From Swiss-Prot:
Primary subcellular site in the record, as a coarse category: cytoplasm
Cofactor: how and how many bound: Binds 2 magnesium ions per subunit.
Organism (species): Xanthobacter autotrophicus (strain ATCC BAA-1158 / Py2)
Gene of this entry: fbp2
Enzyme Commission number: 3.1.3.11
Pathways involved: Carbohydrate biosynthesis; gluconeogenesis
Organism domain of life: Bacteria
GO molecular function, one term: magnesium ion binding
Name listed for the protein in its UniProt record: Fructose-1,6-bisphosphatase class 1 2
Keyword check for Transmembrane: no
Any single biological process term in GO: sucrose biosynthetic process
Any Pfam family matching the protein: FBPase
Enzyme category, top tier: hydrolase
Catalytically driven reaction(s): beta-D-fructose 1,6-bisphosphate + H2O = beta-D-fructose 6-phosphate + phosphate
Length: 329
């Protein structure tokens, strides 16, 4: 049996003596450790009284209902990152950037608890992060460090809190999967250089909204539903959890395409996912796993953000299917 590789060992080998990489390794280690604590809170479910309840009457900075556990997760991550070389934290739960370390060389964007609306139903939720380099001499306005196209990311990943606590991570050299070993307390490398199959017969979308979609997306789904007798010439399965980290992990495991389009409803014109906190980190992971990610037409990682809480339509997964969807536009 081959020797198990822990996250700590993997990061040490990857970083070596490079100070920039060491900073990234410290930040990812901190996020992973915070994630273990968040996973424990999620696992206790209704035993943790009030954590699944809506917090106040005002939505979070992204416009979504904020649960108590969203805030607790953000606090856990913020506390974990304080000793690391992270200058600022951008969070889906906070309107403004959160200053951490004035001498830091990183800025990190995080969705502390993606899918928190599913907590009551015991569905997998998770934490998504994006890491960008930061230089105070260059970025005199810290917001400008966050407001860069996703191609500038040096690392990204997500933790999925389900039957197992999973870390899917990239450092620009492929996409790796780590599993938290509850006996040793370590994250252990489970899959290296994940590759999403280019072809698929599986899509994930909330099909109940089809009546609100623009014609290109409606036409794509109609052709999938027509199956082997239709223009696609093959039968499709639909899978939709409604928690993006769970849907994403399925795609990294067995392929498929995830679709969250904009639609005609007020507030849904650009979908509901955030470019900086969700689309960019997942797009980086996807491309490093030989998949593709677009807003339906344009590569996600090339898009210039115009607001730290900007929403964007998102299509990611099996490359050929993402390109097929783009052809409908």
């Amino acid at each position: 049996m081959s020797e198990l590789v822990t996250l700590k060992t993997y990061l040490g080998t990857w970083a070596g003596a490079d100070t920039g990489r060491t900073a990234v390794a410290q930040a990812v280690t901190a996020i992973a450790e915070a994630g273990v604590g968040i996973a424990d809170l999620v696992a206790r479910g209704p035993l943790e009284e009030g954590l699944a309840s809506i917090r106040g009457v005002d939505p979070n900075a992204g416009g979504d209902a904020q649960k108590e556990l969203d805030v607790v997760a953000e606090e856990r991550i913020k506390a974990a990152l304080l000793p690391t070389p992270t200058a600022f934290l951008a969070s889906e739960e906070s309107e403004e950037l959160i200053p951490l370390n004035p001498d830091g060389r990183l800025v990190i964007a995080v969705d502390p608890l993606d899918g928190s609306s599913n907590i009551d139903t015991n569905v997998s939720v998770g934490t998504i992060y994006s890491i960008l380099p930061y230089d105070a001499a260059v970025h005199t306005d810290p917001v400008s460090a966050v407001m860069r196209p996703g191609v500038n990311q040096v690392a990204s990943g997500f933790l999925a809190y389900g039957p197992a606590t999973i870390l899917v991570a990239t450092f620009g050299e492929g996409t790796q999967v780590f599993v938290h070993d509850r006996q040793t307390g370590e994250f252990v490398l489970a899959r290296t250089n994940v590759e999403i199959p280019a072809e698929t017969k599986e899509y994930g979308v909330n099909q109940s909204n089809v009546r609100h979609w623009a014609e290109p997306m409606s036409a794509y789904i109609a052709d999938c539903l027509a199956g082997k007798d239709g223009p696609r010439g093959k039968d499709f399965n639909m899978r939709w959890v409604g928690s993006m980290v769970a849907d994403a992990f399925r795609i990294f495991t067995r392929g498929g395409v995830y679709v969250y389009p904009g639609d005609k409803r007020k507030g849904y014109e650009n979908g509901r996912l955030r470019l900086i906190y969700e689309a960019n980190p997942v797009a980086f992971l996807t491309e490093q796993a030989k998949g593709a990610a677009t807003d339906g037409k344009t590569r996600i990682l090339d898009i210039q953000p115009h607001h730290i809480h900007q929403r964007i339509p998102l299509v990611f997964g099996s490359k050929a299917e993402v390109e097929k969807i783009a052809s409908y536009y």
